Structure formats: C-alpha cells, structure tokens
Amino acid sequence: MDNKLIWLLPAIGLVVALQPSYIHPDEHFQTLEMLMIKFYGISGTVPWEFEPTNNARSYFPLYAFYGPLFYLMRDILKVQNPLNILRIIRFYNFMLYLSVLYYALPKLVNENKLQNKGRVNEALVFILSSYITWCYQCHSFSNSLETILLLLVLSNYTDILSNKAGLLQLVSTGFLISVGTFTRISFPAFLLLPSIQVFLKVLYRKWIQMVVIAVSMTLSTSIIVYFDTFMYESDEIIIAPLKNVVYNLNVDNLAKHGLHPRYTHLLVNIPLILGPGLLMIRNTKNDFLNLPLLSIISSLFFLSALRHQELRFLLPVVPLFSTLLTRFRYRPYLFRIWLVFNAAMCIIMGIFHQGGVIPMISNINAEQDLTIDIWWKTYSPPTWLYNNDILTVSTTSIVNNIENLDLVQFNVKTNHVVDLKGCDFDLVLEAIQNFRINGVKSLRLIVPNSMTSNVAALNQTYLVTKENSVFPHLDLDHLDSGIQNIIGLSEYKVSL
C-alpha cells in the first residue's frame, strides 16, 4: 500500500498545489510581490518589512530560491501571464520540497535507529498525505523555505553525528544555518537543541568540524549582509534579522498583527496541523535525544514565548513528527481517519479558502479596463497579479485605534486598487463618496457574498450592477452571515 500511495499522493498534491487558493497575505506580499517588482518592474505593494526605513526582511533568500526561476520565466520562457507565473512558482515549490524530502527523510528516520525502508515509506506517506504539504508547503511562504532549510541542516547533523560528514557538508551546514536565519528569525528556535547536541558530541571528538561550520556561517552571513545592504541601497550595514527581532520583541508591534495566548501553538495549532495524526505518534521516551524530537521541543518552547502565534509558524514540524510514528499496520483505522481529516482540510484550505480572489483579478486583467477597484472584506488583493507598471495601491490607516482613509489617493481615477480590508461599512460609503466628489463616474466593488445585505443598502444611493461572480470562494471571516452566504465572491459596478 505504501509504495502505491507514495506515487499517488504527490499527483494529488500537485493538483491541489495548482489551485488558486489564498491562505494568507504573506504568501504573496513577503515573496512574490517583491520579486515581481524587482524582476518584472511592476508597480505593487511594498510590505512594511521591505520599506527602506524598516529593512526587516532579507532579499537574499528570495533571490537564492526564486531568482534563477524568475530569470528563466522572464528572459527565456517569456512568461507574462501572472496566473501562469503563480502556477510555475507553486509547481517549483512542490517539486523542491519533494526532492529535499526524498534526500533528507531517510537520514532522519534512520537517526531514530529504525533502519528499514518500511519506516521511511510510512513517514513519506504521512507527509505526502498531509494537507500542510498540499496547501501550505507549495505556497510561497517564507515558512515553506524554512522547512526545506531545516530538513537539510538536520540531515547534515545526522551525518556529522555518525562521522560521515565531509568538508562539503560542513561548509554547507554553516551556509544553510545562515540562510535559514535570514529567511525567518524563528529558524534558530528549531535548531537550538539539536545544535547543542551536535556541539557537545563533536566538540572533543572532532572540534575542527565546529570551526569549519563557524567559519562558513561567518562568511555566509557577511555575504548576505553585503547583498542586503546593496539591495536596500543603504549607506549603513543592514542586518535584516536583527531589525526583525527588535520589531517582534515589542508587544505593541505584535498587537498590530494579533496577540494570542502563549498556549496557542501547543493546544490549538499543533492539533490543527496534525489532527488525528497525534494519536499515531509512538512512545518517544527512548528517542528523547533524537534530532527531530529535539527540534520539535525546541521550536515549541521558544516560539510559544512570543504572543503572536500563527499556524504556519509550525509548518516544519510535519516532517519532524513523521519520524515519530507507530507503524500504520498497527493502527489502520487511525490512518483512515487521518486521510479523511486531511481530505477535508485540503478542500477547505487548498481549494475553497479565499479561492475567488486570484481568479477575480485574472478576470479583471482580461477586461483590460482598470479604473478603480475597491476590495472590501477579502484578504488583501495580491497586487502583483495585476501585472501593471503604473498601478496605484491605496489602503486604510489606523490612528489612535481609529481606521481612516487618509492614505487613499482619491484623485487617482485609473489603474487604482483600493484595499479597504475589513473596515466598517460607513468607511466604504465615505470612500465611494470621495471618489464621486473627485469626478469618478463608476468604479468596481469586489466583495464576498457574505456582504450582500450591504450591497443592497448601497444600491439605495447608487446604481449597483452585478458584473461577475467567482466560485469557489470561502469566506471564513464572516460565518455570522449564514452558511449560504459565505460561498462566492462578486464584482459589482457602482455608477456614481
């Protein structure tokens, strides 16, 4: 059964990966938005992390992972359609993850002293049947890159501990640790306890290996810092992770993104990630010092200390937990429940969730008539998908906990995207009125079907015509509007 599933599950995963679902804004704005601005010269949304005054994100991981692919798409394949670019990126992410899994997982499973192919295959089946693999890992999250880098470092650690590591692996270990840290500041949290184990076991046996890794880390970090300083065109040295750490240590900053109880990772996110898979984990008392388990403990301990805790921050734990499973044949009923759980989550997160946003932008592009697009009660529209080099992007601002329209450029009447996020309906009315005052005759309003009653109220003042509707689109943020209304995304023409 395992061998058949190992071939079948990647095929299913690839189909899901190519769906236009939209899980979180960061999958676009922290990666693809900046890459499209740099490589294709579009006008888009620069997230706060990449603003020159903040420089809290490193460009190096983006260019290292995606740079060659973007050169290929732009200069050789001549890919211009944003939807095709998105599909290529997701295909690339999925195949890269599979390649790293097939390389690293056997080492991590065997690190648990389980020297047989059946264990490796079952660990692969567990990962490949997880909705996290299908829905999150193929999307362009920095967390997805973090997972890949972590697997590579831990696989190198197993070789170091078993005296199989050569010079190339030692040098690459230092490089990968440096890149991982500049990819996400959470990366060291996954590595701290495993690194301590490696350090203590190797220090007196082959201390020169630690020196090689340290030198490699130092040189790699210097190169990355120089690259980021160049990209930000700064006169001062830019150390992006340091800026990010300082930002995240300020609770007031975290409050802008949402504060969570410190038990959220352990009691909410882990069950959401693993579901019934938690019941498939064997007794690990004899494996306390194995690298995957140490990495899990290390990450949960340190990441739970922070007040902002999102599910995607724990993406790397899926392949780590796969090394701690009991054999499927001992609990076949649990494995079936696991498959049902992941199929359901896949449909919700991999197909339906905010699934109308990307097709809607694609439809608007096909009309080749962009005046003013107002998005309301959806995730922020990935403006890179407009593929527009003269685009103006406006959004709301918050002053003294009051949301306002001070940053919206009402004098811009064409090629203008306005993201009103989840503001009150009164602010939507104010925005439309301000555009009317500035001489705008009509505009687009894109809203989920859960806002139908508000559209009806708007129709009492303006002529509102439904132009288009996209399905599937699941709006989980407004469940109070009724199950029948949370499906679908609609485009309206508002004549002023």
UniProtKB/Swiss-Prot annotation:
Alpha-1,2-mannosyltransferase involved in glycosylphosphatidylinositol-anchor biosynthesis. Transfers a fourth mannose to trimannosyl-GPIs during GPI precursor assembly. The presence of a fourth mannose in GPI is essential in fungi. It is found in: Endoplasmic reticulum membrane. InterPro entries: GPI_mannosylTrfase. Glycans are attached at N156, N459. One of its GO terms (cellular component) is endoplasmic reticulum membrane. It comes from Candida glabrata (strain ATCC 2001 / BCRC 20586 / JCM 3761 / NBRC 0622 / NRRL Y-65 / CBS 138). Its main location: endoplasmic reticulum. Pfam families: Glyco_transf_22. This is GPI mannosyltransferase 4. Pathway: Glycolipid biosynthesis; glycosylphosphatidylinositol-anchor biosynthesis. Keywords: Endoplasmic reticulum, Glycoprotein, Glycosyltransferase, GPI-anchor biosynthesis, Membrane, Transferase, Transmembrane, Transmembrane helix. One of its GO terms (molecular function) is alpha-1,2-mannosyltransferase activity.
